[in-house]
Regions:
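H-loop/switch region of ABC-family ATPase nucleotide-binding domains
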Residues: 155-156
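Conserved ABC ATPase "signature" region
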Residues: 56, 71-89
Length: 194
């Protein structure tokens, strides 16, 4: 995943993502095209900010608001929360949110630059059953956005694969075990070997 977000480079072979070739020029533009929700992002975010300001940090690809922003940018962050069905989080302190509410803030944050891809790495970890189901519904809403990004959803739980997820890649110890259309991969036969 860190390779996909251009945090690491391949140690062998070549990688090309969204037209950017690693090792052949500047790839800083790639980072703007990929949003990510992961524990390594969560750990860097300040807890004292409101939900919409946490979302706004995604516009600057930073864990803090070090650049000046105006009412327009802050309204964009609020609108992003509303578009994901989480308008009730506006004005609330991030540190006081439930784990599921924090995750939806991070998903909204990942969408602030209108990315082509968002990576959701174990997005439901730490959630109870009801919070998990609510978050999965909100993730499905992303596909309804005007410029819906490709959603790369990483999980260890097949039951988290939603209706709108259509392609599956199964890995075991970093190696591809199976890949293809969801209906071809999520079968008792394939999952029994996994």
């Amino acid at each position: 995943l860190r390779l996909l977000t251009a945090d690491f480079f391949p140690s062998e072979g070549q990688a090309e993502i969204l037209g950017y070739s690693f090792g052949n020029g500047d790839i800083t533009g790639l980072r703007k095209q990929i949003g990510i929700v992961s524990s390594f992002i969560t750990e860097r975010l300040p807890k004292h900010m409101t939900a919409e300001k946490i979302v706004l940090t995604g516009k600057f690809k930073s864990s803090i608001l070090y650049k000046a922003y105006g009412d327009k940018e802050l309204q964009e962050a609020k609108d992003m929360l509303i578009s994901l069905g989480a308008g009730e989080l506006i004005g609330r302190q991030y540190h006081g949110l439930s784990q599921g509410e924090k995750q939806i803030c991070l998903i909204a944050r990942s969408l602030m630059e209108d990315p082509d891809i968002i990576i959701l790495d174990e997005a439901t970890v730490g959630l109870d059953l009801f919070a998990r189901e609510k978050l999965l519904r909100q993730i499905d809403r992303i596909t309804l956005l005007p410029h819906a990004p490709l959603v790369l959803y990483v999980t260890h739980h097949a039951e988290e694969i939603t209706e709108n997820m259509d392609h599956i890649l199964l890995l075991r110890q970093g190696k591809i075990v199976a890949q293809g259309a969801k209906n071809d991969i999520i079968t008792p036969e394939v999952l029994a070997d996994f």
